[in-house]
């Protein structure tokens, strides 16, 4: 199941992301964050990854935002 959820992210990383300049504001890129979140939390990791993508904009804080050990849609406090 996790491999099926990760496959579209890998496709994005391999074929779509290289076409655009790097724009992620976080140390762990949003696509890598989603992969780690899916590996840790299964389908809930997809929701965490989508929430992370919504946090990644020019007015957000930058820096580290690691995947938390527990399910949360908020930024990891360790990252602030």
Swiss-Prot record:
Membrane topology: Peripheral membrane protein
Alphabetical keyword list: Cell membrane, Membrane
Family the entry assigns: Belongs to the UPF0161 family.
Pfam families documented for this protein: YidD
Span list, region Disordered: 61-80
Compartments in which it is found: Cell membrane
Record's protein name: Putative membrane protein insertion efficiency factor
